[in-house]
Amino acid sequence: NKIIAGLGVTTLIVAGTVSADTLTDVKEKGYLQCGVGQGLPGFSSPDESGHWQGIDVDVCRAVAAATLGDANKVKYTPLSAKERFTALQSGEIDILSRNTTETFPRDTALGLDFAGINYYDGQGFMVRKGLGISSAKELSGAAVCTNAGTTTEMNAADYFRSNGMDYKIVAFEKMDEVVVAYDAGRCDVFTTDRSGLAAQRSKLK
């Protein structure tokens, strides 16, 4: 498998800062409930012992250390792209620390505070070497696997439309479902952030 192209720049950020009310709740219960991704190596994934690790997890631990004086006072809630904002809005989690692109509509319409950007990335396409494709402009007619309801899905639609190419989207709520579908040959292309493609490639057969 190889990654062949990037689409613009996306940002991976921490969405939702600890407000005064949230901070009070966190201190009263004695731990931070932190929303993370569902297993993205390097960002948020459990090791063989079940301990979460990665950049996003480190942010959770840093917030716990700053608010509670103990980096270990964190409980992790794995969330899909579809679930992440609802979980934060409903109070199921105190903060969200996972790969999430900050956009103007999200910044203004969700009622959430976006913290500073901690990772810049670009979207890419991954295809099997056997297809002999070297450019994203050769993907006309391809079936494309991705996460449903994400900027990744919208960016792909914009890219194919602006280049006058047909394609079929094959979208799933959970990233593991995307990986399984791509591995099983249900689509020709896997698209997400380039860092995500590099991480998920390790799970392919």
Walk through the language-model features, giving the residues of each.
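Alpha-to-beta junction loops
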Residues: 32-33, 69-72, 89-98, 142-143, ...
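Alpha-helix boundary recognition
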Residues: 27-28, 89, 137-140, 180-183, ...
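A ligand-binding cleft/hinge motif common to bilobed small-molecule-binding domains
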Residues: 83, 99-109, 155-162, 181-205
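Bilobed "Venus flytrap"/periplasmic-binding protein-like clamshell domains
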Residues: 33-42, 52-67, 101-102, 121-179, ...
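N-terminal hydrophobic or amphipathic helices and topogenic motifs
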Residues: 3-8, 18-75
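Acidic, polar ligand-binding/catalytic clefts
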Residues: 61, 65, 73-138
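Gram-negative bacterial Sec-dependent N-terminal signal peptides
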Residues: 13-14
